[in-house]
Amino acid sequence: PYELTHQGVSFTDPKSRSWKYFSDIPYPGAPEHFDESFRIIAANIAADRSLATDLRAQLTTEAKASLTRYLAANPGRKTIRSHFEAVSSWAKANGIGPDRIFLGEFGVTRTYGPYKASPPQPLENWLGDVRQEAEARGFGWAFWALSGYGGMSLIETDESVAFDRPTIAALGLKSR
């Protein structure tokens, strides 16, 4: 779900432009997380003094709708499992072995330095759930990047060569 994986990322499309102001989005998510999550998003929008009043109102409305959709879906491991089971069924019906299914990217932006996005626990939960469900079916996977925009990477910060330990742990990798 992009509301989780791309929180803090700037988009121009009206359906996703409010995601720039998303941060601290829970995963797993549920409707009862709405009030706290929306309070954080609304505060992020209000803090952007570059926005005209009407645009601020539009972004708040768009963010509310997007967050509502995300949380109403109850995103969690069960959701991932359901999607991966559908892929497994399709592959089996078409004579494609699980070793030929490759998950090429499933990163999450994270909070550090100038970036305001996911805190460690939701990021670890998401990465761990996706990786474990893929591995349980024999699917291959790769992570987005060694370093890169908004912490969607294995490296701790933009200026660092040190691994981000929560990311490494969630991926089942070991670092020295």
Kindly label every feature range from the protein language model.
Residues Y112-R176:
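Aromatic-rich peripheral "rim/lid" segments of glycoside hydrolase catalytic domains that contact
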